[in-house]
């Protein structure tokens, strides 16, 4: 069974973007390439259990086992040594990526307190969009009782678009609620 968001992309977004930007080929139309979820756990330096809990939460949110990220170099001010585990990340592609994006847009973002849309300034100039989430509780998989500490995460949506304008139209077509 094809994903609801993928069908919307094929049936509605591709024709709309082709008309707006005058693409000659369907392959020239931008698409979402991957979504990277990153959770930096700074307090994992003093307590390794925190990283395990964060990784378990990230696995619940994404439906995929996270990769533990390690410090690249030592920083004395943060009491950090090279090679110490300090975060977790997940790269979603294909079916899981569309499922996550659908869940993010239709369920999770509306659960954010005082939500007025995601900022339009978070594009990087190359058509990718970065979104910071302050608490993991907005995701329906995370139970309030199981959370020991509120942690945020970064969500990077990588697209094949060449410009921010193309990427913005793509994400708007997929239902991303941008602030007015």
Curated annotation (Swiss-Prot):
UniProt keyword annotation of Lipid metabolism present: no
SUPFAM superfamilies membership: RL5-like (SSF55282)
GO function term, MF aspect, one: structural constituent of ribosome
One of the Pfam families matching this protein, by short name: Ribosomal_L5_C
Alphabetical UniProt keywords: Ribonucleoprotein, Ribosomal protein, RNA-binding, rRNA-binding, tRNA-binding
GO biological process, one term: translation
Gene Ontology CC terms, in alphabetical order: ribonucleoprotein complex; ribosome
InterPro entries: Ribosomal_uL5 (IPR002132), Ribosomal_uL5_bac-type (IPR020930), Ribosomal_uL5_C (IPR031309), Ribosomal_uL5_CS (IPR020929), Ribosomal_uL5_dom_sf (IPR022803), Ribosomal_uL5_N (IPR031310)
Source domain of life: Bacteria
Ranges in coiled-coil conformation: none
Cross-referenced PANTHER family: 60S RIBOSOMAL PROTEIN L11-RELATED
Assembly and interaction partners: Part of the 50S ribosomal subunit; part of the 5S rRNA/L5/L18/L25 subcomplex. Contacts the 5S rRNA and the P site tRNA. Forms a bridge to the 30S subunit in the 70S ribosome.
Similarity annotation: Belongs to the universal ribosomal protein uL5 family.
Task of the protein: This is one of the proteins that bind and probably mediate the attachment of the 5S RNA into the large ribosomal subunit, where it forms part of the central protuberance. In the 70S ribosome it contacts protein S13 of the 30S subunit (bridge B1b), connecting the 2 subunits; this bridge is implicated in subunit movement. Contacts the P site tRNA; the 5S rRNA and some of its associated proteins might help stabilize positioning of ribosome-bound tRNAs.
This protein's name: Large ribosomal subunit protein uL5
Organism field: Streptococcus pyogenes serotype M1
Lineage: Bacteria, Bacillati, Bacillota, Bacilli, Lactobacillales
């Amino acid at each position: 069974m094809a994903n609801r968001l993928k069908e919307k992309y094929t049936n509605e977004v591709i024709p709309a973007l082709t008309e707006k930007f005058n693409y000659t080929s369907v392959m020239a139309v931008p698409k979402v390439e991957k979504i990277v979820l990153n959770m930096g756990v700074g307090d994992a330096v003093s307590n390794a259990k925190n990283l395990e809990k964060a990784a378990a939460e990230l696995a619940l949110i994404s439906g995929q086992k996270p990769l533990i990220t390690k410090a690249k170099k030592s920083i004395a001010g943060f009491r950090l040594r090279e090679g110490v585990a300090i975060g977790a990340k997940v790269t979603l592609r294909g079916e899981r990526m569309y499922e996550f994006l659908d869940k993010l847009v239709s369920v999770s973002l509306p659960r954010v307190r005082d939500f007025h849309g995601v900022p339009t300034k978070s594009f990087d100039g190359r058509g990718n969009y970065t979104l910071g989430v302050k608490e993991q509780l907005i995701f329906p998989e995370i139970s309030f009782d199981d959370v020991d500490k509120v942690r945020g995460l970064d969500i990077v949506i990588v697209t094949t678009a060449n410009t921010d304008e193309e990427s913005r139209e793509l994400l708007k077509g997929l239902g991303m609620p941008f602030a007015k």
